[in-house]
């Protein structure tokens, strides 16, 4: 949104109030964070309920909005992975499509842009094409819901002669230049988990005599590094496909502005990043030794130390994405963006992003 406003676009935001804060207040706060609060007059905020007829908008206002909108960007979704939240995820990502699709038809929009995920590719696939997914098995309910949503939207847009772009990012992290981010999940979660474990034992050593740490083979070495015996088992060799948010934004804008017909676009990284690389970066930044990435099944009789057990619990939802062997076709994206590529994930980028995350306490102090 910020980039579109900076380029002079007028935007109508469909959304909801949250936590005793109106939609207008939420958007105003975001624009201040982006440093473009002067663009507030380019934004019209409309309280909506995607589950209601006419999106819960009064009839007269609904008709007026239909007369002024020429494109829709749909990015609302429930990103929960947990199977226990299946009903909620399906309601948000599939059932709630009806209202926004009907609005698009009634408004006779030229384009419908859908923000999906590269992981609609599902499991058991090694080469992922920029086409609708036909697989039946997925890592989690989020992937499944987005794959089904793509098909529903595609059928609807074809039936109603609406051009459709489906934009499929992989895992998005903060700005590669500033480190700034509004969310700290995915890539951040393993790092935050390891930092939390480090701090528990560092505090024990510095303030409580270090008995708990010593019992688990944890100590501060002669170079001042914390030795933290953490073996991370991953099922097989593979990569974690990550892109910075600035690449995601710039690529999405180019696709929106340049595409003239239907298309599916993978916003993924051709440069390989492994958990071994991230573990090395983590050790360097956090002054830790002892983190080991092991590819292959965990032995049944392996006795896990408390450090490893705690880390395993923390990262369980994200484990399938940490050693991914899928390759994503980027032909459409390259053509639509003049071969715009994301940067390789260097230590400097990692350091910048993680230092910002720590500065804002992993998101709890962003707006303070």
Language-model segments: what does each one mean?
Residues 71-74, 82-87, 91, 95-144, ...:
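Conserved Rossmann-fold NAD(P)-dependent oxidoreductase catalytic core, especially the SDR/UDP-sugar
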Residues 172-177, 232-239, 265-273, 283:
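Glycine-rich Rossmann NAD(P)(H)-binding loop
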Residues 250-317:
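Mid/C-terminal beta-alpha module of Rossmann-like enzyme folds, strongest
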């Amino acid at each position: 949104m910020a980039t579109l406003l900076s380029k002079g676009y007028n935007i109508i935001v469909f959304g909801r109030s949250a936590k005793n804060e109106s939609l207008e207040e939420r958007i105003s706060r975001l624009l201040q964070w982006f440093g473009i609060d002067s663009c507030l007059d380019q934004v019209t905020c409309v309280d909506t309920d995607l589950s209601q007829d006419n999106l819960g908008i009064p009839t007269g206002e609904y008709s007026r909005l239909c007369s002024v909108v020429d494109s829709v960007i749909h990015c609302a979704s429930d990103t929960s992975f947990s199977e226990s939240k299946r009903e909620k995820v399906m309601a948000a990502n599939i059932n709630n499509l009806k209202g926004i699709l009907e609005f698009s038809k009634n408004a006779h929009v030229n384009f419908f842009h859908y923000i999906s995920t590269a992981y609609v590719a599902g499991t058991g696939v090694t080469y992922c094409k920029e086409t609708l997914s036909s697989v039946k098995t997925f890592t989690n309910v989020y992937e499944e819901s987005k794959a089904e949503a793509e098909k529903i939207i595609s059928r609807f847009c074809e039936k109603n002669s609406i051009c459709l772009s489906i934009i499929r990012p992989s895992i998005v992290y903060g700005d590669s230049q500033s480190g700034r981010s509004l969310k700290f999940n995915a890539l951040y979660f393993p790092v935050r988990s390891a930092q939390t474990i480090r701090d528990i034992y560092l505090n024990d050593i510095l303030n409580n005599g270090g008995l708990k740490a010593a019992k688990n083979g944890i100590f501060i070495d002669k170079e001042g590094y914390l030795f933290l015996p953490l073996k991370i088992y991953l099922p097989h060799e593979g990569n974690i496909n990550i892109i910075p948010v600035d690449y995601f934004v710039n690529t999405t804008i180019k696709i929106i502005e340049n595409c003239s017909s239907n298309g599916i676009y993978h916003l993924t990284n051709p440069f390989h990043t492994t958990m071994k690389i991230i573990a090395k970066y983590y050790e360097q930044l956090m002054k830790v030794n002892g983190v080991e990435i092991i590819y292959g099944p965990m032995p049944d009789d392996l006795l896990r130390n408390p450090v490893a057990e705690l880390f395993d619990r923390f990262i369980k939802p994200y484990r399938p994405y940490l050693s991914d062997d899928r390759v994503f076709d980027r032909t459409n994206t390259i053509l639509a963006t003049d071969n715009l590529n994301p940067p390789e994930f260097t230590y400097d980028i990692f350091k910048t992003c993680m230092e910002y995350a720590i500065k804002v306490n992993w998101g709890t102090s962003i707006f303070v």
